[in-house]
From Swiss-Prot:
Keyword Hydrolase attached: yes
Taxonomic lineage: Bacteria, Fusobacteriati, Fusobacteriota, Fusobacteriia, Fusobacteriales
Domain of life: Bacteria
Function: Might be a ribonuclease involved in RNA processing.
Residues of the active site: D19
Signal peptide location: none
GO biological process: rRNA processing
Native species: Ilyobacter polytropus (strain ATCC 51220 / DSM 2926 / LMG 16218 / CuHBu1)
Keyword set, alphabetical order: Endonuclease, Hydrolase, Nuclease
A GO cellular-component term linked to this record: cytoplasm
Keyword Hydrolase: yes
Protein name, UniProt field: Mini-ribonuclease 3-like protein
Pfam families hit by this protein: Ribonuclease_3
Length: 127
C-alpha cells in the first residue's frame, strides 16, 4: 500500500488517489460480472460521478470514526477552484470527501471496506 500519514495528508491529493481507487474497484466489480463493454461502461458511469459519490458519502458518514471524519472534513473544505456543471458545489465537495475517504481506506489496507461500500450501493438491477 501507499505510505502516507493521513493526519498530514491534504484533502485534494487524497481525493485524487481515491478517485482512481474507486473507479478501479467499480470497474473490477463489473468485469468480474462478465458484462459486455458497453453495458459495463454505462454501469460504471452511474457510480463514478460526483452526484452518485455525494449520495454514497452522505449514507456512510455517520458510521465513520473520528479519524475518517477528519479526513472527509479536510477534503470537503479544501480550496477547490473549479466545479463541473453536472452537479452542485455541495455535491462536488461531498464527492471530493468521499474520494478522500476511499484513499484513506486504501492506504490503511481496508480494501474490503471499499468493496462493501460498493456492494451496498449497487441497486439490485445493477448487480
Amino acid at each position: 500500500m501507499v505510505n502516507i500519514d493521513l493526519k498530514d495528508a491534504g484533502g485534494l491529493p487524497l481525493a485524487y488517489l481515491g478517485d482512481a481507487v474507486w473507479e478501479l474497484t467499480v470497474r473490477e466489480y463489473f468485469v468480474e460480472k462478465g458484462y459486455k463493454i458497453n453495458t459495463m461502461n454505462k454501469k460504471v458511469k452511474k457510480l463514478v460521478n460526483a452526484k452518485a459519490q455525494s449520495v454514497i458519502f452522505k449514507s456512510i458518514l455517520e458510521d465513520l470514526d473520528e479519524d475518517y471524519k477528519a479526513v472527509a472534513r479536510r477534503a470537503k473544505n479544501s480550496n477547490i477552484k473549479s466545479f463541473p456543471r453536472s452537479c452542485s458545489i455541495m455535491e462536488y465537495r461531498e464527492a471530493t470527501a468521499f474520494e478522500a475517504l476511499i484513499a484513506a481506506f486504501y492506504i490503511n489496507g481496508e480494501t474490503c471496506r471499499i468493496k462493501k461500500i460498493l456492494e451496498n450501493h449497487i441497486s439490485e438491477g445493477e448487480k
